[in-house]
Amino acid sequence: MIKRESYMKKIRPFINSDLVKVLTGIRRCGKSVMLDLIKQELLQQGVTPQQLISYNFENMSFARLCNAQALHDEIISQTQALTGKIYLFFDEIQEVKDWEKCINSLRIELNCDIYITGSNAKLLSGELATYLAGRYVEFVIYPFSFSEFIELYNTIQPNTSEADCFKKYLHFGGMPYLAALQYNEAACKQYLQDVYTSVELKDIVRRNNIRDVDMLERILTYIAANIGTIFSANVLSKYLKSEGRSMATETIINYVKACTDAFLFYQVKRQDIQGKKLLAINEKYYVADHGIREAVFGGNMKDINLILENIVYLELLRRGYKVSIGKLDTKEIDFICEKQDKKIYIQVTYLLAAEETIQREFGFYNEITDNYPKYVLSLDEFDMSRNGIIHKNIRDFLTDASI
């Protein structure tokens, strides 16, 4: 287990506060491990094991507690004889019907500190806004960053170079459990395929009552094949029609929304750089873990430019940036990244091997006249910065948390 200190730094200030700590993210990205890390810190601070009460609602042992009243009554009964603050941990809380009512009641009745995890973005919508508005703080957990991957991979293969680690990261992605499989090719592929199936069936099909699973599969395949490219539900509808299937554009949009709610894909809006407004159409999608894409659909090395974009995009989210795609007339900037009063522009490419590529990637910035930092990221080893535009190796960018 690695410490995932970047997340602990964010969570630590809220430990022992009366705000409910909500950890969200794709299934198997490490949310349960984060709960374990929090428990470890509490025990080191002198909290007794009896004060820590945990429930994992994927465990059939807790099936009888999957409604709000039963869970509430169980916890009240279990804590009656305890003194001092109680620490409550609920893993995959979305399995509990009306869980918001239970959590809010416990927050009021008990001297407690509450942590919950969930694998669906809808966790923070609907009735939650009524019961816990202003009383929770959310932390989105992602699969391993490249820096975390290096830390973990070197416990398995000590002294592996950063470049060799990156080759492994490109192939396997960042799902934490792969380390337990020693990054064995066949075992990892099987595991990632199973994670994908679990997300599809539990977090998309079942949660959204989707009946046409075959159509969902086609949409998932289409999005995965076209990550980092302009998405249009109308175009997808026409594509499906050419395949002998028919689906209304609105239904396609609902299916895609179900996929983003399950954190399988992330939607990125386009921003008009001149008008400084987000555009309502022609967004892009990136996959939560590029290793899942390779295991299920294949083709990552064939689409290396898009996979590198995907890796950089997820890293920007980890660092707390709000990310959009920049549109300037007919030109497009890969990422506009904003955080508080900080703003940077990023172009991502595989290699700056040809003069045409260099002119294209650096030339995008010619018409942007503000003074915010502008980056071109590639796998080239030599610094090719020019005209105030910073060139950086992608590996160096991923391991430089100061950006």
Model-inferred region functions:
Residues 2-16:
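Pre-Walker A adenine-sensing motif
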Residues 23:
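Hydrophobic anchor at the beta1->P-loop junction of P-loop NTPases
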Residues 31:
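Conserved lysine of the Walker
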Residues 34, 38:
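Hydrophobic positions on the alpha1 helix immediately C-terminal to the Walker A/P-loop
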Residues 54-84:
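Short glycine-rich substrate-engagement loop in P-loop NTPases that contacts/grips substrate
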Residues 119-121, 126-230:
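Interdomain motor-coupling "hinge/lid" segment immediately C-terminal to the ATP-binding subdomain
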Residues 183-343:
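Accessory nucleic acid-recognition modules appended to NTPase machines
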Residues 326, 350-395:
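Catalytic cores of nucleic-acid endonucleases
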